[in-house]
Amino acid sequence: MDKKMKRTRIADALHGGLVGQEINIKGWVRTKRGNKAVNFIALNDGSTIHNMQIVADLASFDAAQMSQITTGACIGVIGTLVESQGAGQSVEVQASAIEIYGTADPATYPLQKKGHTLEFLREIAHLRPRTNTFGAIYRIRHHMAIAIHTFFHNKGYYYFHAPLITASDCEGAGQMFQVTTLNPDSLPRTEEGQVDYRKDFFGRHTSLTVSGQLEGEMAAMALGGIYTFGPTFRAENSNTPRHLAEFWMIEPEVAFLEIEDNMDLAEEFIKYCVQWALDNCMDDISFLSEHFDKELIDRLKFVLEKPFVRLAYTEGIRILEEAVKNGVKFEFPIYWGADLASEHERYLVEVHFKTPVIMTDYPKEIKSFYMKLNDDGKTVRGMDVLFPKIGEIIGGSEREADYDKLVARANEMGVPEKDIWWYLDSRRYGTAPHSGFGLGFERLLLFVTGMSNIRDVIPFPRTPNNAEF
C-alpha cells in the first residue's frame, strides 16, 4: 500500500464528493460476505454510524490474506470510490490494495455479527465502543460536550476548574469517597484514639468532590459568570439504572442572577443542547430511536416546542394530591414537605402539563443550606427542571447572599462554620446576588440517546462492586 496517501474518513467519503477518485480508508471489519469471485466487506472507522462497502475482486488478492479478514479485524484499503451498483449504500470502494493491521480470531472475538444484550456489553466495556450502539452514544456524548462549551463561551462565561480533592461536603450528603495515603494496617491515632489525619498527605481528612459549586461561587464573585464541567463522585450504595459513583457535572454560577434569571438560563441551556443534538447527531439519534426508543425524536422535539411551565412546589403538591383523589396511584406518598419522587415529577410533566416543568420554592427542610430563604421563612429559592421519562434533570437555586442568614442556615443544617469559613468570606466581602445550577451530564445523555440505563452513556461505569477496566 502507498504509505504516503492521506487517509480519508468514511464519513467524508460517504458524502459522495470524491466519486471517481482513489482513496485510502482504514477501519474495523463489521462483516464480510461474498462468493468465489468477489467479497463484500463492511468497514467502519468510527467517524459515522454508516459503514463503507469494500468490493474485493478475489482474483486480485491472496486467498490466505483474505481469509484473515474477519469481523473485528483492522484493515487499510486503497481503491476507487464509485457509485454503488447494489442496494443499501450510495457509494463503495473498488479495492486495489488491502493491508491487514490486526486480525480478530472468530473463535474468541466476542462481537460477532449477531445481537448482543446491553448487559453482556457492559461486561466487555473495553470492546463495546466497536458496536454501532456505543459508537453512536459516544459520538453524541462528544457533541453534547461541545454544545455545552459553545453555549457558555458564547454567553461570555468562563470555564473554571474546581478541585477534585476537597475537604468540604457541599451537599451535606456525607456519601463521599475518602482520599488518603495512610496505611490501614498502622493508622496513626490521636490521644482520644481517633485516626490522626494530621499525619495524612494533606494534613487533614479529604475526599473526592461531590460538586464544584462552592468553589464555582468564589469564581463567579470575581469573573461574573463561570461554569464547571468535570467528574464528581458519590459513594452512594445504589445499584439502580439512574446512579453512578463517578459521573460528570456541569455547574454554572453567575453573579447578579436572581431565581427568575436562573430559570431562564436553565431553560435556554437545555434547549440549546437538545437542538444541537438534533442538528449534529441525527444519524446516530435515528439509529438509537429505531433500535431502543421509537419515541425518542418526538420527545426531543417536545422539549423545544413550548416554554417550560414555572410551578411553585406548593401548587405542584396540590395538583398531585388532586390526582390521588381522582384515583391516580403513586408508590410514594404525597404531602407538603415531601421530596418528590421521579414518578411525581413525571406525572406533572407527561400527564398534567404535557411540557417540561421548572418547580420552585421548595420547603427549606429538604434543600441545602446555601439556598436563599424566601420571605415566608418556610421555603427557599430552589428550582428543579423536570423532564419527560427521567424526572429531574437540573437542580439549582438562587444562593443566599446575606452573611447572617447564611450562617444561621448553616447552623440549622448542622454545617460547621469552621469548615466553610472561606465560603462565608464571599458573603463577608463584597457579597452580591448570584445563582447557579447543576446538570448531570449522563442524565442529559440518557435523555438525548433514549437509553434507559445510565451505565450505557458513560464509557467505563463506576458502580458498587464494579471498577473493572
From Swiss-Prot:
Subunit: Homodimer.
Gene: asnS
Reactions performed catalytically: tRNA(Asn) + L-asparagine + ATP = L-asparaginyl-tRNA(Asn) + AMP + diphosphate + H(+)
Localization (cell): Cytoplasm
EC number per UniProt: 6.1.1.22
GO cellular component annotations of the record: cytoplasm
Similarity annotation: Belongs to the class-II aminoacyl-tRNA synthetase family.
Protein species of origin: Porphyromonas gingivalis (strain ATCC BAA-308 / W83)
SUPFAM superfamilies the record matches: Class II aaRS and biotin synthetases, Nucleic acid-binding proteins
Protein name: Asparagine--tRNA ligase
